[in-house]
């Protein structure tokens, strides 16, 4: 005779167990990483599953975490060096900072478990702690703030186009307040803030922090920017900007916008590489000059050089050329009455 099995093939708990196992291994999760895809399916999921002591399906969360860590190792870019072709034509490696893609390991484990229990195929991004602008070769894409500490000069690019260009004053070297280099994401932005430290309390109109208490802001107490001011008359670490430049930057960028801060080899300013000139780029270069101040000189000179490089036929198509000549005249008038440097902290 045969012993009757303790559990028959019509046992409800057994059938529920089988249904749950089939549900879990039947799920496919497709991860989007820009042009790349990663697929999690039953082949991997099945290795995580076992029967628990309560006749329920048990998922080995340590194995799920190990899978998530393989994704993170392959696709995380936060804290990694960034290659940047600068506005000066050279390529630098920006080290330090936290900008980039970073998967939330525990958050992604929880999301995978939820997807399995929902029993439906999904296509999605992983759960991130921090995100970036692009999954391409450069995670900051074509929209970023470029801050050159060596030349004390800033460039703001939006969708590959130069929107703002300005001199600035960074952290005071002689007092140990050097502005840190690295790739960062804008933390937030706000107007009419008061910046406080152990020995100062400074109201500013445009406040854009990107690395703790270090950020970009207007510095209306200064009448000169750029050059070597920062070496002995610099800030407490922030990027001090002319009010007009700070306003344009504030109006263009939002939380998470890439800010790349670097130094170039040597200590002498390098000539900015002129963009490839065509009619639309010249019109754009003229349009971003805005209200003319002493800090507009670089933008005006760049626009003039770009215009001069055009053919006569193309020059005739620059519809805002009168704006350029008016800006040049206004700058000349300002320089003629330029006051002596009273550079304040």
Feature annotation, model-predicted:
Residues 39-40, 201-202, 226-230, 295-300:
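Short, polar loop/linker segments at the starts of domains and inter-domain junctions
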Residues 1-201, 206, 253-255, 260-266, ...:
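Surface-exposed, secretory/extracytoplasmic low-complexity segments enriched in Ser/Thr/Asn/Gly/Pro
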Residues 274-345:
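Beta-rich interaction/scaffold domains
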Residues 43-50, 159, 225, 274, ...:
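Surface-exposed flexible segments
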Residues 66, 178-181, 193-274:
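Exported/periplasmic cell-wall-interacting domains
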Residues 113, 117, 200, 209, ...:
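Alpha-helix boundary recognition
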Residues 54, 98, 236, 305, ...:
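Short, flexible active-site loop motifs that bind/organize anionic cofactors or intermediates
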Residues 60-67, 108, 245-249, 299, ...:
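Stable alpha-helical elements in mature extracytoplasmic
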């Amino acid at each position: 005779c045969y012993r009757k099995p303790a559990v028959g093939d019509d046992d409800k708990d057994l059938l529920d167990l089988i249904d749950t196992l089939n549900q879990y291994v039947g799920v496919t999760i497709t991860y989007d990483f820009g042009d790349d895809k990663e697929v999690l399916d039953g082949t991997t999921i099945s290795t995580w599953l076992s029967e628990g002591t309560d006749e329920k399906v048990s998922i080995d969360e340590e194995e799920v975490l190990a899978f998530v860590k393989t994704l993170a190792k392959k696709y995380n870019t936060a804290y990694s060096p960034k290659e940047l072709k600068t506005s000066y034509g050279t390529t630098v490696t920006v080290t330090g900072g936290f900008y980039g893609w970073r998967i939330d390991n525990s958050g992604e484990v929880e999301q995978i478990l939820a997807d399995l229990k929902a029993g439906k195929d999904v296509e999605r991004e992983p759960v991130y702690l921090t995100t970036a602008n692009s999954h391409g070769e450069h995670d900051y894409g074509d929209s970023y703030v470029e801050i050159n500490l060596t030349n004390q000069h800033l460039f703001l690019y939006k969708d590959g186009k130069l929107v703002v260009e300005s001199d600035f004053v960074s952290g005071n070297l002689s007092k140990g307040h050097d502005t840190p280099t690295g790739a960062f994401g804008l933390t937030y932005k706000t107007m009419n803030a008061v910046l406080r430290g152990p020995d100062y309390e400074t109201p500013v109109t445009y406040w854009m922090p990107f690395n703790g208490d270090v950020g970009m802001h207007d510095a209306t107490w200064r009448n000169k920017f750029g050059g070597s001011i920062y070496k002995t008359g610099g800030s407490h670490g922030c990027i001090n900007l002319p009010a007009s430049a700070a306003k344009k930057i504030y109006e263009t960028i939002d939380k998470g916008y890439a800010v790349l801060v670097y130094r170039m080899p040597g200590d002498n300013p390098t000539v900015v590489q002129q963009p490839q000139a065509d009619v639309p780029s010249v019109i754009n270069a003229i349009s971003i000059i805005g209200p003319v101040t002493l800090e507009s000189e670089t933008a005006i000179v760049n626009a003039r050089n770009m215009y001069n490089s055009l053919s006569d036929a193309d020059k005739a198509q620059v519809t805002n050329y009168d704006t350029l000549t008016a800006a040049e005249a206004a700058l000349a008038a300002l320089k003629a009455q330029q006051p002596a440097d009273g550079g304040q902290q």
